[in-house]
């Protein structure tokens, strides 16, 4: 009985992580779709990140932690370049790359067996379980999508359209 509960909890965790990743992707896309090309690389000051930087960073993180760290794909991440970029990708390219990284990550998560979530991996120099890596990746995605939305709201002001509506609103 306990083993079945553990398997069900692990299955639920894996499914929920993939669902949350897709929700965060939808929210990022809803924000970015409202922006023009110049907005993607806007920085309020030299020490801040643009939406383009944040998208590149999310792509690099998903590729390193999930596709590389868990899926054993080659880790080709250049983290410094994610933050140094000031152009080089169009809005549509960034959206496509982010969509691909999230969907490939969700596909990999969907193929994980529940007994693997306690397996240990060395990712970015950290010894972590697969469960820990997944929780880190989805929380990291949510953190930076929130930043993307915040920048979008600053740039668009009253013309920004929320991607969600509170219960009871029309």
Positions of PLM-derived features:
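Acidic/histidine-rich alpha-helical segments that form the ligand environment
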Residues: 85-122, 129-142
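Short, solvent-exposed, charged loop/turn and helix-capping segments
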Residues: 35-38, 110
């Amino acid at each position: 009985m306990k083993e079945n509960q553990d398997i069900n909890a692990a299955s639920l965790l894996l499914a929920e992580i993939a669902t949350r990743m897709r929700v965060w992707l939808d929210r990022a896309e809803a924000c970015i779709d409202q922006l023009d090309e110049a907005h993607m690389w806007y920085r309020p000051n030299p020490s801040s990140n643009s939406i383009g930087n944040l998208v590149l960073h999310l792509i690099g993180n998903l590729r390193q932690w999930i596709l590389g760290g868990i899926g054993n794909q080659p880790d080709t991440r250049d983290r410094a370049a994610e933050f140094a970029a000031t152009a080089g990708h169009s809005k549509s390219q960034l959206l496509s790359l982010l969509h691909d990284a999230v969907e490939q990550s969700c596909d990999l998560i969907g193929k994980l067996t529940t007994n693997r979530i306690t397996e240990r991996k060395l990712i970015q120099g950290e010894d972590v379980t697969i469960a820990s890596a997944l929780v880190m990746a989805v929380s990291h995605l949510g953190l930076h999508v929130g930043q993307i939305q915040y920048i979008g709201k600053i740039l668009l002001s009253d013309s920004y359209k929320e991607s969600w509506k509170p219960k009871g609103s029309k």
